[in-house]
Amino acid sequence: FNGRGFDVPFLYLRSALLNVAITKKNWLGYRFATEPHCDLAEQFTFYGVSGREGAARRFNLDFYCKAFGIDSPKSQGVTGMDINSLLAEGRYRDIAEYCLRDVRATVELYRLWKTRLAGIK
């Protein structure tokens, strides 16, 4: 979720800062293709067609999870904003559990998108 807008650019820039070679440049692919990368944030906003207003405005993963009855990664009280403090406190298990909830929610949302929205022509 939001891989095109955050995850992939973050990984590229972080790799550059740490002098870690980027082994593949085109992880994102063509913007309007859903292979090899499907950015659910773009899919659920229909590529931002209505800008910041209207039915297709951009919401976060937590919003879509709640809207579609999927357990949100934030349901246990941890958010992405907590990661730095959890890391400083050595709470690696809490971080791992949050990441696992995030992956599970993203997979469930992807499956929902694939069955209910992906086939719209």
Where are these regions (language model features)?
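Metal-dependent phosphoesterase core characteristic of DEDDh/y 3'-5' exonuclease domains
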Residues: 1-96, 101-104, 109, 113-114, ...
